[in-house]
Design a protein with these regions (language model features):
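Short coil/turn segments at secondary-structure boundaries
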Residues: 3, 98-102, 159-163
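Short hydrophobic/aromatic segments of transmembrane alpha-helices and their interfaces
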Residues: 6-7, 34, 288
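Outer-membrane beta-barrel porins/channels
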Residues: 27-29, 137, 142-347
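N-terminal, post-signal peptide beta-strand-biased segments of exported outer-membrane/organellar beta-barrel
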Residues: 22-136
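A generic alpha-helix propensity feature with a strong bias for hydrophobic helices
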Residues: 17, 46, 59, 235-236, ...
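Bacterial Sec-dependent N-terminal signal peptides
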Residues: 1-28
Length: 347
């Protein structure tokens, strides 16, 4: 009994340490032992079958969307005059949002994967997959903006966002061992080949509306950007006549020429699979069967890194600017002449 209590205690500590960094998890797969993909959630959990094989078009496709802000019931409300119609409830959405909200998207396509049991206690798995992971942060003030840009509290609107997008290939080999006392330990080692990345370390934007007598309703914007990217094609920034960046373009080939695009893809087909953006990852986990009805398990997955090198660029910007309105006299001439021209005198 002491041994069981000790395992439960350490499992609780493990979940406490990692819970703050978890935004989504394959909850539906976790205890589905008849599905080979159970190994993706915990390398110590293995399918009940002796062996499995997956090929392109016959393998698994997984995607997952989560958000920390609102749920479905917060989005719609029934129309008061029409019982069979619904409308978007912006007030309820705003109340459900936090100051910072996260939207995550995960996609995994298995190109090939297989696994087999060795004797009774060992299980080996191997897989190659393409992964897309995105995490987008947005503030509540984007919904609050529907009431206007003026703030009675004097606090500027926070319109800063955060984006982290990674596309990469994963080559993973896993091994687990079942011990005689009901404990199973597993580990999965991953080689990562990055394809593209977009990361905003800082993407801060605030909007304040002035109420001073000398600058009534002036719009004051503060910006602070730090954006980093890596893509599989050569590209660069374009600049205007004042040498300010006004856009970006592909420099390695002409994207409007189908012949050049096809030539580039044929010449670089292998480099898309094995890039210079190399990294490593690891999954570790345990599963302890207490009895026929209860078990305790835990895992840490996707712990690793990718060092981005291919066509890596950084864009930084920090500044302030003020919008004081539009001087209509520049477009319509003198205001008094316009008024006088439209005035009629009655005798």
């Amino acid at each position: 009994m002491k041994k069981n209590s000790l395992i439960v205690f350490f499992a609780t500590i493990l979940f406490s340490l990692v819970s703050n960094s978890i935004y989504s998890q394959d909850n539906l797969l976790y205890n589905m032992s008849h599905v080979p993909q159970i190994n993706n959630t915990n390398p110590a959990k293995n399918p009940s079958c002796k062996a499995f094989v997956g090929f392109p078009a016959l393998s698994s496709l997984y995607f997952d969307i989560n958000n920390t802000g609102f749920v479905y019931k917060d989005i719609f409300k029934q129309m008061p005059t029409e019982l069979d119609s619904f409308m978007i409830d912006l007030d309820k959405i705003e109340n459900a949002l936090e100051s910072k909200n996260y939207l995550t998207f995960d996609y995994k396509y298995s190109l090939i994967n297989f696994g087999f049991r060795i004797k009774q206690e060992w299980y080996f798995t191997f897989g190659i997959s393409t992964n897309i992971n995105e995490q987008f942060m947005f503030p509540r003030d984007y919904v609050s903006l529907r009431r206007g840009n003026y703030s009675e509290t004097g606090i500027p609107l926070n319109l800063g966002i955060k984006e982290n997008l990674s596309i990469y290939h994963e080559f993973a080999a896993g091994l687990s061992k079942k011990f005689y006392n009901g404990l199973t330990l597993g580990v999965k080692i991953k080689y990562l080949s990055g394809l593209a990345n977009l990361q905003s370390n800082k993407l801060n934007l605030s909007w304040a509306t002035s109420t001073a007598d000398t600058a009534i309703y002036d719009w004051n914007f503060d910006t602070d950007f730090d954006i980093r990217s890596s893509v599989p094609v050569g590209w660069g920034f374009t600049r205007d006549s004042s040498n300010f960046i006004d856009g970006a373009e592909i420099t390695e080939f002409d994207p409007d020429s189908s012949a050049q695009v096809e030539k580039f893809l044929n010449e670089n087909r292998n480099s898309f699979l094995f890039t210079n953006n190399r990294g490593f990852g690891i999954d570790i986990g345990f599963d302890y069967k207490i009895d026929n009805q209860f078990s305790v398990s835990g895992s840490i997955i996707d712990l690793g890194f990718i060092k981005w090198k291919d066509n890596a660029k950084t864009l930084t910007q920090s500044g302030q600017f003020v919008v004081s309105g539009i001087d209509m006299a520049k477009y319509y001439g003198d205001y008094n002449s316009v008024v006088n021209a439209g005035t009629t005198t009655w005798a």
